[in-house]
A protein has these predicted regions:
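Glycine-rich phosphate/diphosphate-binding loops that line cofactor/substrate pockets in enzymes
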Residues: 1, 74-86
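Mixed-charge interfacial surface used for oligomerization/domain docking
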Residues: 2-4, 12-20, 25-33, 37, ...
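N-terminal glycine-rich anion-binding loop in soluble enzyme alpha/beta folds
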Residues: 6-72
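Ligand-binding "clamshell"
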Residues: 64, 113-119
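N-terminal glycine-rich "phosphate-gripper" loop used for MgATP/nucleotide binding
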Residues: 66-73, 91-97
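Short, charged beta->alpha transition segments
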Residues: 69-79, 104-106
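Short glycine-rich or small-residue beta-strand-to-loop segments that form or flank ligand, phosphate
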Residues: 85-93, 119-122, 136
């Protein structure tokens, strides 16, 4: 732990896992399903994962996703709270209702860890915009800012993140 608290996020930040590992940012992984088989969004840990995913798309098999459930968050947060306070920046509520499950899990764990602080923030962001917000929070953490200072910064900046999207292939949209 680089500071007095743990900064965590979800795999939808569009950054490689190695980056999160280097920055000491624990990640909760989403999954996707194709033909009834579930695959973890592994953020580049498995060199076969991206070719497999794009192979599905090329074969006309569109993946489906599901929100993270309360149990997944509770398990993730429980492990982190054993080590310290947690500031979790969640994937934006405009794309998923998962953040509501994160808030429910946080509430459930408050009784188990009354001495710990667990803050869950709806990033209001997705994709690389989400990644930029988490990256900025990690920079502030590494500069020695407090959990409360970073929370205030994220709450202020999350509405100012400008998202752009482009694709070279339109057949999937």
């Amino acid at each position: 732990m680089r500071s007095g608290f743990i900064l965590s996020c979800e795999s939808t930040i569009d950054l490689p896992y190695s980056y999160c590992e280097q920055r000491e940012i624990p990640v909760l992984f989403y999954s996707y399903q194709v033909d009834g088989v579930s695959y973890e969004d592994d953020m580049g840990r498995d060199p076969e994962a991206l070719p497999r995913f794009y192979g599905f798309l090329d074969a006309g098999k569109l993946p489906s996703t599901a929100q993270l459930n309360e149990f997944q968050y509770e398990t993730f947060f429980d492990t982190l709270l054993q080590q310290g306070d947690v500031l979790h920046i969640a994937f934006g509520s405009g794309m998923t209702a998962s953040v509501q499950n994160a808030l429910l899990a946080a509430e459930a764990l408050r009784e188990k860890y009354p001495e710990r602080k667990l803050i869950v923030i709806d990033s209001l962001c997705s994709s690389s915009g989400y990644g930029l917000l988490v990256d900025g929070a990690a920079d502030l953490r590494d500069e020695g800012k407090s959990m409360d200072e970073i929370t205030d910064w994220v709450l202020e900046k999350r509405k100012k993140v400008h998202h752009q999207f482009y694709s070279t292939e339109l057949k999937f949209y």
